[in-house]
């Protein structure tokens, strides 16, 4: 079947839903597609479509990151429904890195919970520039005062993580009622999308820089070859162009023989697009999540770097005890988790310290066990045992 071409007639924005488990992120995502489908701006999806594979739904917990697409009057959106359960924060770190903005879903019945806070912190760490709040399950709260209190609490929380709490729109919604077709609540979904259009700035695309795409997933398509999927971070890539596969193993050259977005063919993919790239002569085993596809000669992988790091306090979900030089955590870089070592550190003012306490800001030297495409100015998270314990930025490449 010939695939239809993707029409690029509206600005494209990547957003997603974040927030505490069971606050209604997936239901709200489904409601958005259903409300917009009535205007011909989306394909309606139900909860099951978005929640994905059966074993995840049996536990009632979303594990994988689901992608849906829809349009508003002025924009085309790719929307990721991020995992909410604490165990899957790892997925969120890799998923949230793709967001130009996020809808923070918070249930009016509960108010902000542990993961609400963790997701706001993560949004800050991975550089999500703007948030809009969907105060969900408002059909279940009769008392206007309770809603006002929850709104105040959310605004204070946003402020504490350096988001502009007073300015961020909070829209009262009910994903479930909107899904059931209740017109009052459907109009609140439209109000939410108007707020998203207005408050999430159109991203500045880095189209003119050399092409780079971090690999998120790899598929083998019988008779066609290997497809790598991911979000193009910068630059553009045309069919027929040579690209390099960099990181984890030896760099190798391949040719892009096809570019697809949402099952439609493109002549070229541009910064911000979530695409699948068909690669010539590459086996599925040759490429894995965490590698990057780049313009030939534009980037080399590295193992040693200096970074500026904030180590989370115990109250923020970080470590309870100090760590010392030689500490071996996981470094989350783009879509990769790489084991590494913090070989040396000083206090952020350059003075010597024996150990790093939760809440400290440090300058550190890190060494990774395998080479990865790290660059100056890039953000990373430091994790251990399934939780974020630090957030940093690469200040200098050493080797």
Curated annotation (Swiss-Prot):
Residue sites binding Mg(2+) per the record: 26
Pfam families for the chain: GTP_EFTU (PF00009), GTP_EFTU_D2 (PF03144), GTP_EFTU_D3 (PF03143)
G4: annotated span: 136-139
Residue stretches making up the tr-type G domain: 10-204
Chain spans, region G2: 60-64
Top-level division of the source organism's lineage: Bacteria
Positions with a binding annotation for GTP: 19-26, 81-85, 136-139
This protein's name: Elongation factor Tu
UniProt source species: Prochlorococcus marinus (strain MIT 9312)
């Amino acid at each position: 079947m010939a695939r239809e071409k993707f029409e690029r007639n509206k600005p494209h924005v990547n957003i997603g839903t974040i927030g505490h488990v069971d606050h209604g992120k997936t239901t709200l995502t489904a409601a958005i597609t259903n409300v917009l489908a009535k205007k011909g701006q989306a394909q309606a999806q139900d909860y099951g479509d978005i929640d994905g594979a059966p074993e995840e739904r049996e536990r009632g917990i979303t594990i994988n990151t689901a992608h849906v697409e829809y349009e508003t009057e002025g924009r085309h959106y790719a929307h990721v429904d991020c995992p909410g359960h604490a165990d899957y924060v790892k997925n969120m770190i890799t998923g949230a890195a793709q967001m130009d903005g996020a809808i923070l879903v918070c249930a009016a019945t509960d108010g902000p919970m542990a993961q609400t806070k963790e997701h706001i912190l993560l949004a800050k760490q991975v550089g999500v520039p703007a948030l809009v709040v969907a105060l969900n399950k408002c059909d279940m709260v009769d008392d206007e005062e309770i809603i006002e209190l929850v709104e105040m609490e959310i605004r204070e929380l946003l402020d504490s993580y350096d988001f502009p709490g007073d300015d961020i729109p909070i829209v009262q919604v009910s994903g479930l009622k909107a899904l059931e077709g209740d017109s009052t609540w459907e109009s609140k979904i439209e109000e939410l999308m108007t707020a998203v259009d207005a408050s999430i700035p159109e991203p500045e695309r880095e189209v003119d820089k050399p092409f780079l795409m971090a690999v998120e997933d790899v598929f083998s398509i019988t008779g066609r070859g290997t497809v790598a999927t991911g979000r193009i971070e910068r630059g553009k890539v045309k069919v027929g162009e040579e690209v390099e596969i960099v990181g984890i193993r030896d760099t190798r050259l391949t040719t892009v023989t096809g570019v697809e977005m949402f099952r439609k063919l493109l002549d070229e993919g541009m910064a911000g697009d979530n695409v699948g790239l068909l690669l010539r002569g590459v086996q599925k085993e040759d490429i894995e999540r965490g590698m990057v596809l780049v313009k030939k000669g534009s980037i080399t992988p590295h193992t040693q770097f200096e970074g500026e790091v904030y180590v989370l306090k115990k109250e923020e979900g970080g470590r309870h005890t100090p760590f010392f030089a030689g500490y071996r955590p996981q470094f989350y870089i783009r879509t990769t988790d790489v084991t590494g070592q913090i070989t040396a550190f000083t206090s952020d003012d350059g003075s010597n310290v024996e150990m790093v306490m939760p809440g400290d800001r440090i300058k550190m030297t890190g060494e990774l066990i395998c080479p990865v495409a790290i660059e100056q100015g890039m953000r990373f998270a430091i994790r251990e045992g399934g939780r974020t314990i630090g957030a940093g930025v690469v200040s200098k490449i050493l080797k």
